[in-house]
Amino acid sequence: MTSRGWRLGAVVVLAAICAAGPERQEVIRTASDLGPLPADRYDYTPQDYQRSQRASALLIRQCMAEHGHPDFPLDPRYPGNTVVATAVSTDYGVLDLAAARRWGYGWDPEKRVALRPKGRRMTNAEYADFPACSAEASRRLMHGIDLKRDWLYASTRALEVDKAVKRDPRLRAALDAWSRCVAEQGFTRYPDPVAAYTDTAWQRGGDGNTRHTQRERATAVADVTCKRRHHTAELWHAARAQKQAVDITRHRDRYAAGLQALRTYRATIAEVLRKLG
């Protein structure tokens, strides 16, 4: 879709939501339910992350074998105990009402267990050589990419784009309506859903999870309920689509170079997986 198409589409979404009033809309439970954004094609994806982790592990194992560690595992644990941090938030805060009722602004602690390394613990000798092999794997995966200029250019622009999004009068009105709604249910009047999600009152632990207190869960339920009532996530998403489309048009060459860098990276990963995987 062209940038102009994105802008027109976002305007249509904004107008449709505003005109629809309180009638029932499609329930939004995850950010993906809102649809793609213009900058998505220029950015790193969860699949990229999974494939890069696999490719990196294969390269590290190869390097470690060259350093005298022939049985180094693909998914090793560190010599000491480490904390695995889990991140499950979205740009729009919590969206799933069922999850809010049960976990508040946190998540099922069993998810953390699933992220723990499956391999054996590294020996001290392996751990001594691991950093150099990890750095070498990164260099190989990033070969041919200008890291300072081109790598994940869309991500470097995201901060400026989000500043423009927050200045959008329609979004500011939407966030104000959401804020009033949450306060009217007896909770803190947060300026936006991100402030609610990151409230220190939830006492996140070292892994990022919260304590799931009754107050936290009740606040999260009010948060999601008010988002649905006022179509906060939809309006926010539409505003982001508009601003991203404008930014892509203004910096077309840089975005194109960033996309080419991402394609180079993906091709390198595919080659590593083909040869070693």
Regions found by a protein language model. Name each.
Residues M1-R24:
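Secretory targeting and sorting signals
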Residues A20-G277:
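Cell-envelope/extracellular polymer assembly enzymes that use nucleotide-activated donors
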